Amino acid sequence: MGTWCERCRRRDEQDYRNLDDCQKHFLLLMMGDFQHEIRGEQIVEQLTIPKEFVQRLKGDIPEEIQLETHNRNSYTVRVDKSQEKVIFAAGWAQFVKTFDLHMGDSMMFRFKGNSQFDVIIFDQVGREKVCSVAVDDYLDPNVQEGRTDATETLNSSRAHSQDDYLDPNVQEGRTNATETLNSSRAHSQPMPMQTPATETLNSSRAHSQDMPMQSPATETLNSSRAHPQPMPMQLPTETVNHFHAPHYPMQMPIENMALSRTQAMPTQMQSPPTYRWTQVQRDNLRYSLPSEDQGCRVGVIPDPIIGRRTKLNPVQEKVVNFKIQHIHSEIPIFVAVIKRSNVSGVLSTLSVAKRYVDEYLGGERFISLSRLGGKWGIRLLLVGVGVAQGW
């Protein structure tokens, strides 16, 4: 009976391996140091995939994969292979930060083909994380690019519709006015200094010429008459001192011409865009704002409290500082280094700093340790303030 069941299991295992990789799913639980690993004296942000997962795939995992969530956000992760291990290296830290992965969360992978994996992210109680499903237009560059293209297309269509409704004679008048303006800029000469009497005489003579010289205010007035406006336009009243005017060609200000065209367009009211933030952004904002209950400066994380006889090496200090940044605790954290005497022997105890117990635990002598949803009751002994019963 046992041999037959073993043969059936092997046959089922082989049949599963022969399936297309697109039909296979893998559930990975975030446990231990899923964010980083220690190599020598360096902390490497990476994740090691169990070899049992890799062995069930027919094909090899490429050196670079795409992790795509339900909201169509894709993240590139580099894959390192060493000693039959598959490791998510570069890009994995950004993925963890974006979706606020914590210990106890889980991820379901499904091979999609072309080096792509569909990823479903669950929290500690098995609910799908909202930040991996909801589409955030503010963070998605593709949506932003699509919005920009749509806005440009809409503005272009409105501009063409305005030109189509104009009278052909008015359009021809605009073209002629533009050509005349360009011609006057190309052949304009410096304006000589004239007295008021001479200027009046020359002004009367200028009206008999083919191309009259006009001031910016007069050109704006003629432009407004050639293009009917829906509202009256007030002409600027400027006093020009011809005796101190510099020698430069007469040119029509582009601002006046643009102003007259802008007034012909209807005023558009635009409401400010509504942005939706992910849980990661809301948490970062909440811990960066000042609080009345906080006794430290804004953005400063309290230093951990370490036992009197405990000394951390440089690697352990890096690990502790890295974990504290992701815990966001408002009170100091007690750090203990587990030794062999703490986990072996007839009576295994763990010493806790008396200063930490007096200041943050008060008169409590029963505490609760929790990890991955489980809780264990611990009793504190007054002698040496060591954790005894329940440890």
Curated annotation (Swiss-Prot):
<dbReference type="Pfam" id="PF02362">
    <property type="entry name" value="B3"/>
</dbReference>
<dbReference type="InterPro" id="IPR003340">
    <property type="entry name" value="B3_DNA-bd"/>
</dbReference>
<keyword id="KW-0539">Nucleus</keyword>
<keyword id="KW-0238">DNA-binding</keyword>
<protein>
    <recommendedName>
        <fullName>Putative B3 domain-containing protein Os08g0325100</fullName>
    </recommendedName>
</protein>
<keyword id="KW-0805">Transcription regulation</keyword>
<dbReference type="GO" id="GO:0005634">
    <property type="term" value="C:nucleus"/>
</dbReference>
<feature type="compositionally biased region" description="Polar residues">
    <location>
        <begin position="172"/>
        <end position="226"/>
    </location>
</feature>
<dbReference type="InterPro" id="IPR044837">
    <property type="entry name" value="REM16-like"/>
</dbReference>
<keyword id="KW-0804">Transcription</keyword>
<dbReference type="InterPro" id="IPR015300">
    <property type="entry name" value="DNA-bd_pseudobarrel_sf"/>
</dbReference>
<dbReference type="GO" id="GO:0003677">
    <property type="term" value="F:DNA binding"/>
</dbReference>
<feature type="region of interest" description="Disordered">
    <location>
        <begin position="143"/>
        <end position="232"/>
    </location>
</feature>
<feature type="DNA-binding region" description="TF-B3">
    <location>
        <begin position="32"/>
        <end position="125"/>
    </location>
</feature>
